[in-house]
């Protein structure tokens, strides 16, 4: 069973690496940032069993835990660097420490969003699968963490894009 879990986790990591451009010289614009959030949630949807049962999987398979932690730390470092680049360009207002804290909070929400949504479902509902609305709301939550740090037109555009991820009835409340 461990071989199967580790093979699936490797596919998950490969999919995330492709989305995040790990090891590639991607430009680091605001558009890259929201697209990164969106595509990361698509990968999470494809491999939701990992996120939904993360604590249990990591407890049962210590090698998985080690690899997940390394991947998480790498992601936080890359996002923190992305935020510092945006800050240097004047698009984002954050110190190095705030950029690191923002990256950590993004990782926290992204990693555990499915757990929260599953807990919020009524007992006995189709909690095994997370729908597109739940993932869209996760994208919105992450983008809402980033938006206050943005400046000027960049902030307003990011906010407009973020609102598109809200369910129809919630958009104008």
Regions inferred by a protein language model and the residue ranges of each:
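An amphipathic alpha-helix adjacent to DNA-recognition modules
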Residues: 1-21, 34-38
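Secondary-structure edge/capping motif, primarily at the C-terminal ends of alpha-helices
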Residues: 20-24, 51-58, 86-90, 117-124
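Non-transmembrane, amphipathic alpha-helical segments
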Residues: 25, 32, 36, 60-67, ...
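Short, hydrophobic secondary-structure boundary micro-motifs
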Residues: 52-55, 67, 95, 158-159
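Amphipathic alpha-helical packing segments from all-alpha helical-bundle domains
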Residues: 63-89, 100-115, 133-148
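C-terminal peripheral helix-coil segments that are non-catalytic and often amphipathic
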Residues: 115-173
């Amino acid at each position: 069973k461990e071989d199967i879990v580790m093979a699936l986790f490797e596919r998950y990591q490969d999919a995330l690496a492709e989305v995040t451009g790990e090891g590639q010289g991607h430009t680091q614009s605001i558009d890259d940032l929201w697209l990164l959030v969106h595509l990361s949630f698509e990968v999470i949807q494809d491999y939701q069993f990992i996120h939904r049962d993360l604590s249990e999987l990591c407890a049962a398979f210590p090698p998985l835990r080690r690899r997940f932690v390394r991947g998480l730390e790498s992601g936080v470092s890359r996002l923190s660097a992305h935020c510092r680049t945006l800050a240097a360009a004047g698009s984002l207002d954050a110190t190095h420490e705030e950029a690191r804290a923002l990256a950590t909070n993004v990782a926290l929400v992204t990693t555990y969003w499915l757990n929260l949504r599953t807990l919020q479902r009524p007992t006995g509902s189709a909690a095994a699968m997370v729908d597109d609305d739940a993932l869209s709301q996760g994208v919105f939550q992450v983008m809402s963490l980033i938006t206050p740090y943005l400046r000027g037109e960049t902030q307003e555009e990011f906010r407009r894009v973020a609102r598109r991820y809200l369910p129809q009835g919630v958009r104008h409340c």
